[in-house]
Amino acid sequence: FFVDKFQIPLAKSYGADAILIILAGVSDKLANELYEEALRLDMSVIVEVHTVDEAKQALKFKDALIGINNRNLKTLKTDINTTFDIHDVLVSHTGPLISESGIKTKDELLELSNKTSIKTFLIGESLLKDLENNSIFSVL
């Protein structure tokens, strides 16, 4: 993730083609600057949200992918209901939506896919913990 717009050209020079803006970690002004700089350099932008208020703020980033992170940044606990709570705010966004973190089972993945317009998921911890069973892999 980025905290200064001067990081973006450097990342681009190292081959990056996208940046992550975590709205909980930057001011509104800086989020705008990061977004504009990335677009200027023909890079994709993922805007990450954790709350309904951040989701409302993210709607102005029309060319971004928006990720709903199910991890509470204060407690580090995950809850996929975060995606359900925030999704309705983002239905007008024309770009891709991503549900991030906390997806532990095939049933949770299917529930998110069936009850929202989201078809893109970031799954990390569950995949690493399930390397032997591979049960979640069969859904992907």
Task: Please provide the spans of the model-predicted regions.
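Catalytic cores of alpha/beta
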Residues: V3-G15, H50-K62, H93-I123, S135-V139
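Glycine/Thr-rich beta-alpha phosphate-binding loop at enzyme active sites
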Residues: L59-H87
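Aromatic/hydrophobic pocket-lining residues that form π-stacking "cages" and hydrophobic walls in ligand
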Residues: L34, A38, I86
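Glycine-rich phosphate-binding active-site loops on the catalytic face of alpha/beta enzymes
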Residues: I8-K29, G67-L76, T116-F137
